Amino acid sequence: MISVDSSVVVDLLGNDERADAAEDALRRALALGPVVVCDIVVSEVGAGLGYGSNFVDTLEEAGIRYSPTELRSAIRAGEMQRRYKQRLTTDGRNPSARRSVPDFLIGAHALLQCNGLITRDEGFFRDYFKGLRVVVPRTAH
């Protein structure tokens, strides 16, 4: 089972090079097994694009299932965000910078409940979720 990040779901809903790359990555993942989104991705995409209940139909048509975040994943996400903030402070950067809880929840869900994550944010997920298989949709240039 592989999870899909919010950025890739948004790409799937588009009509450009990124959409084509996301569709290709999704097709390859579906050939290997179930593909899921967690509750965080559903809420992020729903809030950002306002799809509401139509979003569920869109996911089902694409072959993407729903997988809620388990308690152990939520705990790991909190631990990873704490480490992230400590690292920023140690490096002299603002600890409230950039990464919010949803990023860590998505990563922890993929690491502990799935076998990988399809995302455009390769660097962050490889850095903070060691051992997580990261699949990056590639556009044809």
Where are these predicted regions, by residue range?
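Short, well-structured N-terminal submotif of metal-dependent ribonuclease cores
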Residues: 1-37, 46-64, 129
